[in-house]
Amino acid sequence: MTDAVQNETVQEASAQEENKLIAERRAKLDQIRKSCKANGHPNDFRRDSLAGDLQKEFGEKSKEELEALNHVVAIAGRVMAKRGPFLVIQETSGRIQAYADKDVQKVLKDKYQGLDIGDIIGVKGALHKSGKGDLYVNMEEYELLTKALRPLPEKFHGLTDQEMRYRQRYVDLIVNEDSRNAFVVRSKVMSAIRNFMISKQFMEVETPMMHVIPGGASARPFITHHNALDMPMYLRIAPELYLKRLVVGGFDRVFEINRNFRNEGLSPRHNPEFTMMEFYMAYADYKDLMDLTEELLSSVALEVLGSTSMPYGEHTVEFGGTYTRMSMFEAIKHYNPDHAQIQALTEEDIQNRDLMVSIAKSVHVEVEPFWTCGQLLEEIFGETAEPKLMQPTFITGYPADISPLARRSDDNPFFTDRFEFFIGGREVANGFSELNDAEDQDARFKAQVEAKESGDDEAMFYDADYITALEHGLPPTAGQGIGIDRLVMLLTNTHTIRDVILFPAMRPQA
Protein backbone atom coordinates (compact mmCIF):
# COMPACT_ATOMS: atom_id res chain seq x y z
CA MET A 1 0.00 0.00 0.00
CA THR A 2 1.44 3.37 -1.01
CA ASP A 3 1.71 6.26 1.48
CA ALA A 4 -0.93 8.21 -0.48
CA VAL A 5 -3.41 5.32 -0.36
CA GLN A 6 -2.65 4.74 3.32
CA ASN A 7 -3.22 8.42 4.14
CA GLU A 8 -6.50 8.39 2.21
CA THR A 9 -7.62 5.32 4.14
CA VAL A 10 -6.76 6.96 7.47
CA GLN A 11 -8.63 10.14 6.47
CA GLU A 12 -11.71 8.14 5.48
CA ALA A 13 -11.66 6.30 8.80
CA SER A 14 -11.30 9.57 10.71
CA ALA A 15 -14.18 11.10 8.76
CA GLN A 16 -16.38 8.10 9.52
CA GLU A 17 -15.56 8.30 13.22
CA GLU A 18 -16.22 12.04 13.25
CA ASN A 19 -19.57 11.59 11.51
CA LYS A 20 -20.52 8.96 14.08
CA LEU A 21 -19.66 11.32 16.96
CA ILE A 22 -21.63 14.15 15.35
CA ALA A 23 -24.67 11.89 15.02
CA GLU A 24 -24.39 10.89 18.69
CA ARG A 25 -24.18 14.53 19.76
CA ARG A 26 -27.17 15.51 17.64
CA ALA A 27 -29.15 12.74 19.32
CA LYS A 28 -28.16 14.11 22.73
CA LEU A 29 -29.26 17.60 21.69
CA ASP A 30 -32.61 16.23 20.55
CA GLN A 31 -33.11 14.70 24.00
CA ILE A 32 -32.11 17.96 25.70
CA ARG A 33 -34.58 19.93 23.61
CA LYS A 34 -37.42 17.73 24.77
CA SER A 35 -36.72 18.55 28.41
CA CYS A 36 -35.57 22.19 28.10
CA LYS A 37 -37.86 25.17 27.71
CA ALA A 38 -35.11 27.11 25.87
CA ASN A 39 -34.93 24.56 23.05
CA GLY A 40 -31.57 23.37 24.33
CA HIS A 41 -29.92 26.81 24.24
CA PRO A 42 -30.67 28.69 27.50
CA ASN A 43 -29.59 32.31 27.87
CA ASP A 44 -30.26 33.06 31.53
CA PHE A 45 -26.97 31.96 33.14
CA ARG A 46 -24.78 34.85 34.34
CA ARG A 47 -21.16 34.33 35.32
CA ASP A 48 -19.57 36.58 37.91
CA SER A 49 -15.95 35.43 37.76
CA LEU A 50 -13.16 34.70 35.28
CA ALA A 51 -10.62 31.92 35.71
CA GLY A 52 -7.65 34.26 35.38
CA ASP A 53 -8.98 36.64 38.01
CA LEU A 54 -9.69 33.79 40.41
CA GLN A 55 -6.16 32.45 39.97
CA LYS A 56 -4.70 35.89 40.76
CA GLU A 57 -6.93 36.53 43.77
CA PHE A 58 -7.11 33.09 45.36
CA GLY A 59 -4.24 31.10 43.83
CA GLU A 60 -1.90 31.71 46.78
CA LYS A 61 -4.43 30.91 49.48
CA SER A 62 -4.21 27.59 51.27
CA LYS A 63 -6.76 24.81 51.07
CA GLU A 64 -7.88 25.58 54.62
CA GLU A 65 -8.24 29.31 53.94
CA LEU A 66 -10.47 28.65 50.94
CA GLU A 67 -12.67 26.26 52.91
CA ALA A 68 -13.08 28.90 55.61
CA LEU A 69 -13.93 31.58 53.04
CA ASN A 70 -16.61 29.46 51.34
CA HIS A 71 -16.42 31.85 48.36
CA VAL A 72 -19.15 30.93 45.86
CA VAL A 73 -18.57 31.81 42.20
CA ALA A 74 -20.37 31.42 38.89
CA ILE A 75 -18.12 30.50 35.98
CA ALA A 76 -18.83 29.62 32.37
CA GLY A 77 -16.80 28.33 29.47
CA ARG A 78 -15.97 25.43 27.19
CA VAL A 79 -15.28 21.93 28.52
CA MET A 80 -11.77 20.99 27.39
CA ALA A 81 -11.31 17.82 29.42
CA LYS A 82 -13.46 15.43 31.44
CA ARG A 83 -11.69 13.14 33.89
CA GLY A 84 -14.19 11.33 36.07
CA PRO A 85 -15.65 13.92 38.46
CA PHE A 86 -13.34 16.71 37.21
CA LEU A 87 -13.96 19.05 34.29
CA VAL A 88 -11.47 21.50 32.80
CA ILE A 89 -13.28 24.67 31.74
CA GLN A 90 -11.65 27.17 29.38
CA GLU A 91 -12.66 30.76 28.72
CA THR A 92 -11.00 33.95 27.55
CA SER A 93 -8.81 34.45 30.63
CA GLY A 94 -7.61 30.89 31.11
CA ARG A 95 -8.66 27.55 32.56
CA ILE A 96 -10.10 26.33 35.84
CA GLN A 97 -11.37 22.97 37.06
CA ALA A 98 -14.85 22.09 38.27
CA TYR A 99 -15.58 19.11 40.50
CA ALA A 100 -18.81 17.14 40.68
CA ASP A 101 -18.93 14.84 43.71
CA LYS A 102 -20.99 11.66 43.77
CA ASP A 103 -24.02 13.37 45.28
CA VAL A 104 -24.05 16.02 42.55
CA GLN A 105 -23.56 13.38 39.87
CA LYS A 106 -26.56 11.47 41.24
CA VAL A 107 -28.71 14.58 41.06
CA LEU A 108 -27.54 15.46 37.56
CA LYS A 109 -27.55 11.83 36.36
CA ASP A 110 -27.77 11.72 32.56
CA LYS A 111 -27.22 15.46 32.34
CA TYR A 112 -23.62 15.10 33.55
CA GLN A 113 -22.92 11.80 31.81
CA GLY A 114 -24.10 13.25 28.49
CA LEU A 115 -21.57 16.07 28.66
CA ASP A 116 -19.02 16.10 25.82
CA ILE A 117 -15.68 17.78 25.26
CA GLY A 118 -16.37 21.11 23.57
CA ASP A 119 -19.72 21.74 25.26
CA ILE A 120 -20.22 25.18 26.81
CA ILE A 121 -21.48 25.09 30.39
CA GLY A 122 -22.17 27.28 33.40
CA VAL A 123 -21.17 26.17 36.90
CA LYS A 124 -21.84 27.59 40.37
CA GLY A 125 -20.10 26.52 43.54
CA ALA A 126 -17.54 27.31 46.21
CA LEU A 127 -13.84 27.65 45.45
CA HIS A 128 -11.58 24.90 46.76
CA LYS A 129 -8.03 23.74 46.28
CA SER A 130 -6.92 20.21 45.44
CA GLY A 131 -4.15 18.30 47.16
CA LYS A 132 -1.88 19.30 44.26
CA GLY A 133 -2.63 22.96 44.87
CA ASP A 134 -4.98 23.50 41.91
CA LEU A 135 -8.03 25.75 42.25
CA TYR A 136 -11.38 24.19 41.44
CA VAL A 137 -15.06 25.01 41.76
CA ASN A 138 -17.01 22.51 43.85
CA MET A 139 -20.00 22.13 41.56
CA GLU A 140 -23.34 22.85 43.24
CA GLU A 141 -25.26 23.93 40.13
CA TYR A 142 -24.56 23.09 36.51
CA GLU A 143 -26.22 24.13 33.27
CA LEU A 144 -25.50 23.13 29.69
CA LEU A 145 -25.53 26.37 27.70
CA THR A 146 -24.50 25.18 24.23
CA LYS A 147 -24.14 21.63 22.95
CA ALA A 148 -21.12 21.28 20.65
CA LEU A 149 -22.18 19.13 17.71
CA ARG A 150 -18.68 18.68 16.33
CA PRO A 151 -15.80 17.13 18.30
CA LEU A 152 -12.65 19.14 18.86
CA PRO A 153 -9.63 18.07 16.79
CA GLU A 154 -7.78 16.50 19.72
CA LYS A 155 -9.90 13.46 18.93
CA PHE A 156 -8.00 13.32 15.65
CA HIS A 157 -4.48 14.01 16.99
CA GLY A 158 -4.85 17.78 17.11
CA LEU A 159 -5.27 20.48 14.51
CA THR A 160 -2.10 19.73 12.54
CA ASP A 161 -3.28 20.84 9.10
CA GLN A 162 -1.74 24.31 8.78
CA GLU A 163 -4.18 25.47 6.12
CA MET A 164 -7.16 24.27 8.16
CA ARG A 165 -5.90 26.36 11.08
CA TYR A 166 -6.39 29.46 8.93
CA ARG A 167 -9.68 28.38 7.36
CA GLN A 168 -11.20 27.40 10.69
CA ARG A 169 -9.53 29.94 12.94
CA TYR A 170 -12.31 29.49 15.52
CA VAL A 171 -11.18 25.89 16.07
CA ASP A 172 -7.51 26.92 16.08
CA LEU A 173 -8.23 29.45 18.84
CA ILE A 174 -10.07 26.87 20.92
CA VAL A 175 -7.29 24.27 20.89
CA ASN A 176 -4.09 26.24 20.26
CA GLU A 177 -2.87 28.37 23.15
CA ASP A 178 -0.02 29.83 21.08
CA SER A 179 -2.53 31.18 18.55
CA ARG A 180 -4.64 32.75 21.28
CA ASN A 181 -1.58 34.34 22.84
CA ALA A 182 -0.42 35.77 19.50
CA PHE A 183 -3.69 37.61 19.04
CA VAL A 184 -3.67 38.83 22.63
CA VAL A 185 -0.23 40.29 21.91
CA ARG A 186 -1.57 41.85 18.71
CA SER A 187 -4.37 43.56 20.62
CA LYS A 188 -1.92 44.86 23.22
CA VAL A 189 0.39 46.17 20.48
CA MET A 190 -2.47 48.12 18.91
CA SER A 191 -3.43 49.61 22.27
CA ALA A 192 0.17 50.47 23.15
CA ILE A 193 0.75 52.22 19.82
CA ARG A 194 -2.50 54.15 20.11
CA ASN A 195 -1.72 55.27 23.67
CA PHE A 196 1.82 56.29 22.71
CA MET A 197 0.63 58.41 19.79
CA ILE A 198 -2.02 60.13 21.88
CA SER A 199 0.60 60.87 24.55
CA LYS A 200 2.60 62.67 21.85
CA GLN A 201 -0.39 64.91 21.03
CA PHE A 202 -1.37 63.09 17.83
CA MET A 203 -5.07 63.06 16.98
CA GLU A 204 -6.59 59.80 15.74
CA VAL A 205 -8.62 60.21 12.55
CA GLU A 206 -10.46 58.09 10.00
CA THR A 207 -10.09 58.59 6.27
CA PRO A 208 -11.96 56.95 3.36
CA MET A 209 -11.57 53.25 2.62
CA MET A 210 -12.88 53.71 -0.92
CA HIS A 211 -11.02 56.15 -3.17
CA VAL A 212 -11.95 57.75 -6.45
CA ILE A 213 -8.23 57.83 -7.28
CA PRO A 214 -5.91 55.30 -5.60
CA GLY A 215 -2.76 56.82 -4.20
CA GLY A 216 -0.27 57.04 -1.37
CA ALA A 217 1.77 53.98 -2.38
CA SER A 218 3.00 52.07 -5.40
CA ALA A 219 0.69 49.06 -5.64
CA ARG A 220 -2.10 47.47 -7.66
CA PRO A 221 -5.51 48.44 -6.25
CA PHE A 222 -8.69 46.43 -5.88
CA ILE A 223 -11.43 47.90 -8.07
CA THR A 224 -15.13 48.00 -7.18
CA HIS A 225 -18.19 49.84 -8.51
CA HIS A 226 -20.41 52.36 -6.76
CA ASN A 227 -23.91 51.61 -8.04
CA ALA A 228 -25.61 54.85 -6.95
CA LEU A 229 -22.90 57.04 -8.46
CA ASP A 230 -22.32 54.64 -11.37
CA MET A 231 -18.55 54.97 -11.13
CA PRO A 232 -15.52 52.81 -10.41
CA MET A 233 -13.90 53.12 -6.98
CA TYR A 234 -10.77 51.66 -5.46
CA LEU A 235 -10.15 50.08 -2.08
CA ARG A 236 -7.45 52.17 -0.54
CA ILE A 237 -3.84 51.14 -0.90
CA ALA A 238 -2.76 53.80 1.62
CA PRO A 239 -4.36 56.72 3.51
CA GLU A 240 -1.39 59.04 2.92
CA LEU A 241 -2.87 61.66 0.60
CA TYR A 242 -5.98 62.11 2.75
CA LEU A 243 -3.95 62.41 5.94
CA LYS A 244 -1.76 65.09 4.37
CA ARG A 245 -4.88 66.95 3.29
CA LEU A 246 -5.72 67.11 7.00
CA VAL A 247 -2.32 68.63 7.75
CA VAL A 248 -3.02 71.23 5.05
CA GLY A 249 -6.31 71.88 6.88
CA GLY A 250 -4.51 72.64 10.14
CA PHE A 251 -4.33 69.36 12.07
CA ASP A 252 -0.59 69.33 12.72
CA ARG A 253 -0.36 65.79 14.17
CA VAL A 254 -2.64 63.03 12.93
CA PHE A 255 -2.55 59.24 12.88
CA GLU A 256 -4.74 56.40 11.67
CA ILE A 257 -4.71 52.67 12.41
CA ASN A 258 -6.66 50.87 9.73
CA ARG A 259 -6.68 48.44 6.82
CA ASN A 260 -5.01 48.83 3.45
CA PHE A 261 -5.76 46.66 0.42
CA ARG A 262 -3.32 45.73 -2.33
CA ASN A 263 -4.22 43.43 -5.20
CA GLU A 264 -1.00 41.47 -5.10
CA GLY A 265 0.31 38.00 -4.35
CA LEU A 266 0.25 35.96 -1.16
CA SER A 267 3.46 35.14 0.68
CA PRO A 268 4.74 34.64 4.24
CA ARG A 269 5.12 38.45 4.38
CA HIS A 270 2.16 39.60 2.29
CA ASN A 271 -1.60 39.49 2.67
CA PRO A 272 -3.83 41.52 0.32
CA GLU A 273 -5.61 43.02 3.35
CA PHE A 274 -3.30 44.28 6.08
CA THR A 275 -3.14 46.77 8.94
CA MET A 276 -1.03 49.93 8.99
CA MET A 277 -0.48 52.73 11.45
CA GLU A 278 0.23 55.88 9.45
CA PHE A 279 0.99 59.26 10.99
CA TYR A 280 2.02 62.78 9.99
CA MET A 281 3.59 65.58 11.99
CA ALA A 282 4.05 69.15 10.82
CA TYR A 283 7.30 71.06 11.40
CA ALA A 284 9.39 67.89 11.48
CA ASP A 285 11.65 65.95 9.10
CA TYR A 286 12.57 62.32 8.49
CA LYS A 287 15.29 62.41 11.15
CA ASP A 288 12.69 63.36 13.75
CA LEU A 289 10.67 60.35 12.59
CA MET A 290 13.60 58.01 13.15
CA ASP A 291 14.02 59.33 16.70
CA LEU A 292 10.29 58.93 17.37
CA THR A 293 10.30 55.40 15.92
CA GLU A 294 13.07 54.32 18.27
CA GLU A 295 11.08 55.63 21.22
CA LEU A 296 7.81 54.13 19.99
CA LEU A 297 9.07 50.61 19.31
CA SER A 298 11.10 50.30 22.51
CA SER A 299 8.07 51.57 24.46
CA VAL A 300 5.70 49.09 22.78
CA ALA A 301 8.04 46.13 23.30
CA LEU A 302 8.54 46.99 26.96
CA GLU A 303 4.83 47.50 27.61
CA VAL A 304 3.64 44.40 25.76
CA LEU A 305 6.43 41.89 26.51
CA GLY A 306 8.13 43.44 29.52
CA SER A 307 11.48 43.59 27.72
CA THR A 308 13.10 45.32 24.75
CA SER A 309 15.07 42.14 23.96
CA MET A 310 13.33 39.15 22.39
CA PRO A 311 14.06 36.01 20.35
CA TYR A 312 13.34 35.92 16.65
CA GLY A 313 14.23 32.62 15.03
CA GLU A 314 17.88 31.95 15.79
CA HIS A 315 18.53 35.59 16.64
CA THR A 316 17.94 37.88 19.60
CA VAL A 317 16.48 41.20 18.50
CA GLU A 318 17.04 44.34 20.59
CA PHE A 319 14.43 47.10 20.36
CA GLY A 320 16.13 49.33 22.93
CA GLY A 321 18.85 51.91 22.37
CA THR A 322 19.86 53.72 19.19
CA TYR A 323 19.27 51.93 15.90
CA THR A 324 21.79 51.58 13.06
CA ARG A 325 21.43 54.17 10.27
CA MET A 326 22.98 53.78 6.84
CA SER A 327 22.12 54.70 3.27
CA MET A 328 20.93 52.14 0.74
CA PHE A 329 24.16 52.72 -1.21
CA GLU A 330 26.25 52.09 1.94
CA ALA A 331 24.26 48.95 2.79
CA ILE A 332 24.78 47.45 -0.66
CA LYS A 333 28.54 47.97 -0.45
CA HIS A 334 28.66 46.76 3.17
CA TYR A 335 26.85 43.48 2.50
CA ASN A 336 28.63 42.69 -0.80
CA PRO A 337 32.32 42.91 0.20
CA ASP A 338 33.45 40.43 -2.46
CA HIS A 339 31.51 41.86 -5.42
CA ALA A 340 34.03 43.85 -7.46
CA GLN A 341 31.49 45.87 -9.46
CA ILE A 342 29.58 46.89 -6.34
CA GLN A 343 32.76 47.81 -4.46
CA ALA A 344 33.83 50.02 -7.36
CA LEU A 345 30.38 51.68 -7.57
CA THR A 346 30.07 55.41 -6.83
CA GLU A 347 26.90 57.38 -6.09
CA GLU A 348 27.21 58.97 -9.53
CA ASP A 349 27.32 55.49 -11.11
CA ILE A 350 23.83 54.77 -9.78
CA GLN A 351 22.46 56.95 -12.58
CA ASN A 352 24.19 54.78 -15.22
CA ARG A 353 21.35 52.44 -16.14
CA ASP A 354 23.43 50.02 -18.21
CA LEU A 355 25.84 49.56 -15.32
CA MET A 356 22.99 49.09 -12.83
CA VAL A 357 21.32 46.51 -15.09
CA SER A 358 24.62 44.61 -15.29
CA ILE A 359 25.01 44.59 -11.50
CA ALA A 360 21.38 43.62 -10.96
CA LYS A 361 21.69 40.63 -13.28
CA SER A 362 24.93 39.58 -11.60
CA VAL A 363 23.06 39.19 -8.29
CA HIS A 364 20.21 37.25 -9.92
CA VAL A 365 17.64 40.04 -10.19
CA GLU A 366 15.19 39.56 -13.07
CA VAL A 367 15.19 43.03 -14.60
CA GLU A 368 12.02 44.60 -16.02
CA PRO A 369 12.53 46.80 -19.10
CA PHE A 370 10.72 49.80 -17.57
CA TRP A 371 12.73 49.90 -14.35
CA THR A 372 14.50 53.14 -13.52
CA CYS A 373 17.95 53.43 -11.96
CA GLY A 374 16.32 53.87 -8.56
CA GLN A 375 14.28 50.70 -8.98
CA LEU A 376 17.39 48.78 -9.97
CA LEU A 377 19.22 50.06 -6.88
CA GLU A 378 16.31 49.03 -4.67
CA GLU A 379 16.13 45.55 -6.21
CA ILE A 380 19.88 45.02 -5.73
CA PHE A 381 19.48 46.10 -2.11
CA GLY A 382 16.48 43.81 -1.60
CA GLU A 383 18.31 40.83 -3.05
CA THR A 384 21.67 41.22 -1.31
CA ALA A 385 21.27 43.33 1.84
CA GLU A 386 17.72 43.35 3.17
CA PRO A 387 17.63 39.71 4.42
CA LYS A 388 20.74 40.40 6.52
CA LEU A 389 19.23 43.33 8.48
CA MET A 390 18.28 41.39 11.60
CA GLN A 391 18.79 44.19 14.13
CA PRO A 392 16.79 47.46 13.93
CA THR A 393 18.18 49.45 11.00
CA PHE A 394 17.12 52.63 9.21
CA ILE A 395 18.03 52.59 5.53
CA THR A 396 18.14 56.10 4.03
CA GLY A 397 19.08 57.58 0.66
CA TYR A 398 16.15 56.43 -1.50
CA PRO A 399 16.22 57.78 -5.07
CA ALA A 400 13.50 60.26 -6.05
CA ASP A 401 12.28 58.10 -8.93
CA ILE A 402 11.04 55.45 -6.47
CA SER A 403 9.86 58.01 -3.90
CA PRO A 404 7.24 60.10 -5.72
CA LEU A 405 5.82 61.64 -2.53
CA ALA A 406 9.07 62.34 -0.67
CA ARG A 407 11.02 65.60 -0.43
CA ARG A 408 14.25 65.77 -2.43
CA SER A 409 17.52 65.88 -0.51
CA ASP A 410 19.13 69.31 -0.29
CA ASP A 411 22.55 67.67 -0.70
CA ASN A 412 21.71 65.62 -3.81
CA PRO A 413 18.32 65.99 -5.54
CA PHE A 414 18.65 62.51 -7.08
CA PHE A 415 17.90 61.20 -3.57
CA THR A 416 15.13 61.99 -1.10
CA ASP A 417 14.86 62.53 2.65
CA ARG A 418 13.38 59.09 3.10
CA PHE A 419 14.06 55.95 5.11
CA GLU A 420 12.71 52.47 5.45
CA PHE A 421 13.01 50.64 8.75
CA PHE A 422 14.13 47.00 8.75
CA ILE A 423 14.27 44.40 11.48
CA GLY A 424 14.31 40.62 11.35
CA GLY A 425 15.33 40.80 7.69
CA ARG A 426 12.18 42.59 6.55
CA GLU A 427 10.78 46.08 6.10
CA VAL A 428 8.46 47.16 8.90
CA ALA A 429 8.13 50.92 8.32
CA ASN A 430 8.55 53.59 5.67
CA GLY A 431 8.87 57.31 6.36
CA PHE A 432 10.08 60.54 4.83
CA SER A 433 10.03 64.29 4.81
CA GLU A 434 6.96 65.05 2.75
CA LEU A 435 7.13 66.68 -0.66
CA ASN A 436 5.27 69.97 -0.21
CA ASP A 437 6.35 71.59 -3.49
CA ALA A 438 3.16 71.47 -5.56
CA GLU A 439 4.99 71.92 -8.87
CA ASP A 440 7.51 69.17 -8.16
CA GLN A 441 4.67 66.87 -7.05
CA ASP A 442 2.79 67.64 -10.27
CA ALA A 443 5.85 66.67 -12.33
CA ARG A 444 6.39 63.44 -10.37
CA PHE A 445 2.76 62.41 -10.74
CA LYS A 446 3.10 62.91 -14.50
CA ALA A 447 6.25 60.76 -14.50
CA GLN A 448 4.29 58.05 -12.65
CA VAL A 449 1.57 58.19 -15.31
CA GLU A 450 4.22 57.69 -17.99
CA ALA A 451 5.63 54.73 -16.07
CA LYS A 452 2.15 53.18 -15.85
CA GLU A 453 1.71 53.63 -19.60
CA SER A 454 5.07 51.87 -20.08
CA GLY A 455 3.87 48.78 -18.22
CA ASP A 456 4.44 49.52 -14.53
CA ASP A 457 1.13 48.38 -12.99
CA GLU A 458 2.17 49.66 -9.57
CA ALA A 459 2.91 53.24 -10.64
CA MET A 460 0.71 55.94 -9.12
CA PHE A 461 -2.23 57.75 -10.65
CA TYR A 462 -2.36 61.52 -11.14
CA ASP A 463 -4.39 63.13 -8.32
CA ALA A 464 -5.41 66.66 -9.32
CA ASP A 465 -7.26 67.38 -6.06
CA TYR A 466 -4.17 66.52 -4.03
CA ILE A 467 -2.17 68.98 -6.14
CA THR A 468 -4.84 71.58 -5.38
CA ALA A 469 -4.44 70.83 -1.66
CA LEU A 470 -0.67 71.33 -1.91
CA GLU A 471 -1.23 74.62 -3.70
CA HIS A 472 -3.01 75.83 -0.55
CA GLY A 473 0.21 75.13 1.35
CA LEU A 474 1.43 72.04 3.22
CA PRO A 475 3.76 73.04 6.07
CA PRO A 476 7.11 71.24 6.38
CA THR A 477 5.88 67.77 7.35
CA ALA A 478 7.17 64.27 7.97
CA GLY A 479 5.09 61.11 7.73
CA GLN A 480 5.47 57.41 8.28
CA GLY A 481 3.64 54.10 7.95
CA ILE A 482 4.28 51.10 10.22
CA GLY A 483 3.11 47.61 9.27
CA ILE A 484 1.27 46.27 12.30
CA ASP A 485 1.19 42.68 11.05
CA ARG A 486 4.94 42.48 10.50
CA LEU A 487 5.62 44.15 13.84
CA VAL A 488 3.43 41.58 15.60
CA MET A 489 5.27 38.80 13.74
CA LEU A 490 8.49 40.01 15.34
CA LEU A 491 7.03 40.37 18.81
CA THR A 492 5.52 36.87 18.69
CA ASN A 493 8.50 35.17 17.00
CA THR A 494 6.26 34.21 14.08
CA HIS A 495 7.49 33.71 10.52
CA THR A 496 4.33 33.86 8.44
CA ILE A 497 1.88 36.74 8.33
CA ARG A 498 -1.07 34.33 8.36
CA ASP A 499 -0.28 33.47 11.97
CA VAL A 500 -0.94 37.06 13.11
CA ILE A 501 -4.02 37.83 10.97
CA LEU A 502 -7.18 36.29 12.38
CA PHE A 503 -8.75 35.52 9.01
CA PRO A 504 -6.08 35.68 6.28
CA ALA A 505 -6.86 35.51 2.57
CA MET A 506 -7.10 31.91 1.34
CA ARG A 507 -7.50 30.27 -2.02
CA PRO A 508 -10.91 28.59 -2.51
CA GLN A 509 -10.98 24.97 -1.44
CA ALA A 510 -11.06 22.44 -4.27
Swiss-Prot record:
Q: What's the Enzyme Commission number for this chain? A: 6.1.1.6
List localization entries.
Answer: Cytoplasm
Q: Which residues bind Mg(2+) 1?
A: E420, E427
Q: Which parts of the sequence bind Mg(2+) 2?
A: E427
User: Does Magnesium appear among the keywords?
Assistant: yes
**PROSITE patterns, per the entry:** AA_TRNA_LIGASE_II
| GO molecular function annotations of the record | ATP binding; lysine-tRNA ligase activity; magnesium ion binding; tRNA binding
From the UniProt record, give one GO term of the biological process aspect: lysyl-tRNA aminoacylation
Give the record's cofactor note, including how many are bound: Binds 3 Mg(2+) ions per subunit.
Look at the named UniProt entry and state the broad enzyme category this protein falls under. ligase
Matching Gene3D superfamilies: Bira Bifunctional Protein, Domain 2, Nucleic acid-binding proteins
> Where would one find the signal peptide in this protein?
none
The record's annotation in Pfam families points to: tRNA-synt_2, tRNA_anti-codon
| InterPro entries per UniProt | Aa-tRNA-synt_II (IPR004364), aa-tRNA-synth_II (IPR006195), aa-tRNA-synth_II/BPL/LPL (IPR045864), Lys-tRNA-ligase_II (IPR002313), Lys-tRNA-ligase_II_N (IPR044136), Lys-tRNA-synth_II_C (IPR018149), NA-bd_OB-fold (IPR012340), NA-bd_OB_tRNA (IPR004365)
Q: Which domain of life is it from?
A: Bacteria
- Report one GO cellular component: cytosol
Cofactor(s) required for function per UniProt:
Mg(2+)
Q: Which reaction does it catalyse?
A: tRNA(Lys) + L-lysine + ATP = L-lysyl-tRNA(Lys) + AMP + diphosphate
Q: What UniProt keywords apply to this chain's record, in alphabetical order? A: Aminoacyl-tRNA synthetase, ATP-binding, Cytoplasm, Ligase, Magnesium, Metal-binding, Nucleotide-binding, Protein biosynthesis
User: Oligomeric state and partners?
Assistant: Homodimer.
State the family it belongs to.
Belongs to the class-II aminoacyl-tRNA synthetase family.
Q: Supply the name of the protein.
A: Lysine--tRNA ligase
Q: Which species is listed as the source? A: Vibrio vulnificus (strain YJ016)
